[in-house]
């Protein structure tokens, strides 16, 4: 049983007395009667009224199960309907308990992206069609959270998030980091307080009825001062049902947060008892061009503790604009391509999808890391399936397997298992596959487990693969083994030596470096060998980061004598 309520503001433009009746009729859900409250109002005045009632078993809204009801307001005069308006509403509960962020009592993980409103032809105006396609693409990539960076989104976007199931952090249109965060910050002068409070409260009033909005963000990178303290108090006076977030001053809000922590730092928050708040990463995995590294490592750390809520990748969509070339073709361009100076170069190309909503390679990495089903092999060679969902079982999925032999599919079939419940782990045997009984020596076998939708969803068709894992099977060990005479090992305080017929190898006892390799009495090295690795630079590095010695060590190999 759950107590539900509604607060309404009504203005009657008629001179004569009218009558207001507000029925709330849920669709396809148990409900004890129809809530109805007549109210007589006189013309040209504003009234506020509230409506309370009890549901026996309401279907709660979550990103996994976005159950919605329809609220209908009817204005009548002398028994005749003058006007009707309706709105979709959802019932869900957001609380913080014991430093854990809970939605409907469960410690959900927010698997998110930061989203700017951007279209390659219309700029910051985004069509309703693109908004819907973006949300559907998010759902297909297992993204369940959006941080509206760094301003409230188009009203239609919240409607879509209510409908499809996306947890939203709504963020006020405040950013002044050009002044940085010291005494010059606009967050300090009292004359700037009304501007801060007005923008934040306008966001709260406009979007407070959306179940998808599960937290308020006071702004982004705008200093820690008293103006945000005043605004936070105003938010709490208006809405106690959602926690607040502000990365630049964790002390005044409900959530703890920072930007771009290391994986180790993220992992350390799991056991940090001196930090008494849920931990949320407002920006991480900066995805400029070929970046977004360590995403799986981040999520190993995030999933190590209920106190770590999750986070939002920077960011969702490239903010490029089309430029028509002399040959008539269109090219997605960024800073400097329009002869604009100064500019920020490719800094607007941080997306998980291209400006035209084409998935980038990172999109598929996000989809796999964010997936809500994990499959692995147990030590005794069985298949372990973990349902990471908090509210739904695995009955909506067809589970299939494919056996590959050196990468080529040789067998496939269905994996019949009981549907794992929310947060449940089940273990099943590997299917009886003839090719596994007669494995070829030295051949690499892998079992791919796939989870596909049994039915159409609003964001994907039947048969769409939402999750998969590839399980590496042991290689058959029947290859001939090379036989060599036993060697000799000698240990000293400064070096360890392995020797055999006509050779010896020395390792530095302190560093582990390969110090010398001698063959037939002839030393081959002038200096000890050391790791000298080179990788392609990421687009995150050429700016300020590339000036740090730590970065140069990775990108600039040095020659060694050998």
Where are these regions (language model features)?
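Catalytic cores of secreted or luminal carbohydrate-active enzymes
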Residues: 328-377, 388-396, 437-477, 524-526
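Intrinsically disordered, low-complexity Pro/Gly/Ser/Thr-rich segments with frequent PxxP/GP/PP motifs
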Residues: 32-49, 54, 408-439
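Substrate-binding/catalytic cleft of secreted carbohydrate-active enzymes
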Residues: 135-141, 145-350, 354, 361
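Beta-strand/loop-rich accessory regions of lumenal/periplasmic or secreted enzymes
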Residues: 62, 430-442, 455-457, 470-556, ...
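Extended acidic/polar, glycine-enriched regions
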Residues: 7, 11-95, 453, 457, ...
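Single conserved hydrophobic/aromatic residue that forms the stacking wall/gate
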Residues: 1-5, 10, 554-562
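Beta-strand-rich binding/interaction modules
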Residues: 6-7, 11-29, 386, 392-413, ...
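N-terminal carbohydrate-binding accessory modules
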Residues: 74-137
